[in-house]
């Protein structure tokens, strides 16, 4: 699916279940979660009671940093799958690259973790495998050692954070780009240029940001627990951003970024 529903910071329990149900009601079929979000169980309950057949759903989860390595990743996957109440997962990602310390060591860690994903894929427990927050210098050594190349790279992507180098690398290697935080922070939604462009199309700034991701060949994963915003974020297929406006958005100064750099994170 070309549009997904993100669940980062989505509360566990009824609020989360209601949010996923609302997303399913509004046509989302791609639900993105992760072991680190602590809400896989909630997502699983919502899917089981959401009234949508399994074959129509596309479910993503991710292995966390403390479970890197071959055996630990296989164990972590089974824990995630049990919480989600699924026979298989549609997409499994390495959440963050190992990138600290000696280069040879972190490259080996990523390669061993990837080998576990390849095993899950070949065993039919995962339909697609990929990475998250990987830059080209993380991807290249992993790809050199891989039997199966990454199919997806999920990165922070929004106006003011256009990740051109990583997107171009992924496009060259047929790696699908997914966009977490496609709306950026509140500063993105308050940017006057984006407000003016959105007004010219009769859409909200949030819709403009999501549409920009789509037209930049990325799959946006907007998140919300507000029913109205969940619905609004799905209504992005009725307009096209012109090439001129796409370029104006591309050229925004850095804006609304999370500050999370895969080369320097310490979690």
Regions found by a protein language model. Give the residues of each.
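N-terminal binding-site loop/beta-alpha segment at the start of enzyme catalytic domains
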Residues: 1-57, 116, 265
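Active-site mouth loops of central-metabolism enzymes
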Residues: 3-14, 63-70, 101-106
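Short, acidic/polar
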Residues: 11-24, 69-84, 137-140, 162
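Beta/alpha (TIM)-barrel catalytic core signal, keyed to glycine-rich beta->alpha loops juxtaposed to Asp/Glu
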Residues: 12, 97-267
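Residues at the N-termini of beta-strands
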Residues: 30, 88-91, 128, 152
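Acidic (Asp/Glu)-rich catalytic clusters
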Residues: 44-54, 81-86, 143-146, 167-173
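A short, structured active-site edge motif that brings together acidic residues
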Residues: 54-67, 88-97, 156-157
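CE4/NodB-like, metal-dependent polysaccharide N-deacetylase domain
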Residues: 73-94, 119-123
